[in-house]
Regions:
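Short, charged, surface-exposed hinge/linker loops at domain edges
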Residues: 441-450
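Mixed-charge, Lys/Arg-enriched low-complexity segments
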Residues: 435-441
Length: 450
């Protein structure tokens, strides 16, 4: 999955396939996004040239429609090719916010015959917020996607207690995400006055061209071509967004609490590993920006990671670096299974005590299918993050990023063109190349000498 709009080929193995082959019952409950969940054409990615053959790879003839909206229209039944990337059971949620689709959307339309009215922004509940993409939804808390996912996950846990086989459940909440629309009491659970903009745009000593473009659009009153594009916001709007995001997070916390209580009620808590993490962050006010984009600020790449293990529920915090791709190898090791050839992550189990480092550096890759934030080409970004530095290289751009995290943890002074940082830049660039070389696929393994 190089970027949004691609589907993970069905011929790809996943660590969930390994768990399933090892006797685990497997479930995906909530957002999957292993296939496209809109039917819109991408921006700026149209090939206007006449070609005899259009792509380097032949199509595998799979339509990849398991997550697109039309698949779930009119309440029709959806039969997944089972298993779905290793998941034997699927409760699908697509999209974000109050108007999610998939199995949830089918349930919502059946449960609430007035669903169109509940989704109509003209019926927004009264409120004093004006930040972009905020919406006080009239949907009841118990019918919001976060609660529905919690309900389905509790049902799955209860059913698993009756089975002999162990289970793996991927419970994925679309929130926190724009649109910013926590339901019910979660809307005004937090006040914007509880938050502050600690990194205003003026805090950056030499804003990158991408940041300058976001600022230019804000000053000109322009908006992005699509709602997903990062934008600059006023301090007031940033604080409103923070408050609404906190409401969405608290609602998820409450659902996680329900899952843990269900495990305890069923006598499974002392035999279940619980992993809590996220796919990425949000600028959420850093330099007055909201949403996300090619700039790999810490607010985007630093995510929560909790590994709660029945072998030791003692809280230990480690400062070692890790990567999302390490989750698969770690889960397989904990389950007692060997990873397949070609898995790029490495297990971090031995670092959980806090004494043994896991990684000294992390490679972060970002591709997009349309140009954003004033970039001249479609973003292809490669970042190396160590405890002391962050280096980001932007293909086909005449600028990059280099931050001394020991002396500038908030990334306010870009040293890319600083002669005093040339030695560090060269060393990090070499290390980045080594990481990229290491990423070369080793699967499939050769079956002949030559």
């Amino acid at each position: 999955l190089r970027y949004n709009g691609c589907a993970l080929p069905r011929r790809a193995n996943t660590f969930v396939d390994v768990l399933s082959a090892g006797g685990y019952r497997t479930a995906s409950i909530g957002k999957s996004h292993l296939q496209p969940f809109t039917e819109k054409e991408p921006l700026g990615n149209k090939d206007t040239k006449e070609r005899l053959i259009s792509e380097a790879w032949k199509s595998d003839e799979n339509p990849y429609i398991a997550e697109q909206p039309s698949t779930y229209e009119d309440g029709k039944g959806v039969e997944f090719e089972s298993p779905y990337y290793g998941f034997q059971h699927v409760d699908m949620v697509t999209g974000h916010g109050y108007a999610c689709g998939g199995h949830y959307g089918q349930w919502f339309r059946k449960k609430y015959p007035n669903w169109k009215e509940l989704h109509d922004r003209k019926n927004e509940l009264p409120n004093n917020y004006s930040c972009p993409q905020s919406f006080r939804t009239p949907i009841p808390e118990e019918a919001y996607p976060t609660a529905w996912i919690g309900d389905r996950a509790v049902d799955y846990i209860n059913d698993s207690a009756k089975q002999d086989a162990p289970f793996f459940a991927f419970v994925s909440f679309p929130d926190p995400h724009h649109p910013f629309n926590p339901p019910g009491k979660y809307w005004d659970m937090y006040s914007p006055d509880e938050f502050s903009v600690d990194l205003p745009y003026s805090a950056h000593k030499n804003p990158t061209p991408a940041m300058q473009d976001v600022n230019r659009m804000w000053e000109a009153g322009e908006s992005g071509a699509i709602p997903q594009m990062a934008f600059r916001a006023s301090d007031e709007h940033v604080k409103e967004t923070m408050a609404l995001t906190a409401g969405m997070i608290t609602m998820i916390d409450d659902q996680v609490g329900r899952l843990i209580q269900s495990l305890k009620d069923n006598g499974q808590y002392d035999n279940t590993v619980i992993v809590f993490t996220s796919d990425h962050g949000d600028y959420l006010g850093d330099f007055n920006m909201l949403l996300k984009g090619p700039l790999k600020l810490g607010s985007i790449t630093r995510v929560p990671m909790i590994w709660s293990d029945p072998n030791s529920r003692t809280a230990v915090r480690t400062k070692t670096l890790g990567s999302t791709i390490d989750l698969s190898a770690s889960i397989l090791e904990r389950a007692g299974f060997e990873p397949y050839n070609g898995m790029q992550g490495k297990s971090f189990l031995r670092s959980l005590s806090g004494d043994e480092p896991h990684r000294d550096e992390v490679l972060i890759e970002f591709n997009n299918n349309d140009a954003r934030m004033g970039m001249v080409t479609v973003p292809r970004v490669r970042t190396l993050r160590s405890k002391s530095w962050r280096l980001s290289v932007y293909a086909d751009e005449d600028w990059g990023e280099l931050y001394d995290l020991e002396n500038d943890p908030n990334e306010t002074h870009n040293l890319w063109n600083d002669e005093k940082a040339e030695k560090a830049k060269l060393k990090l660039s070499l290390r980045l190349v080594e990481h990229l070389a290491r990423q070369t696929d080793s699967s499939p393994r050769s079956k002949r000498l030559a």
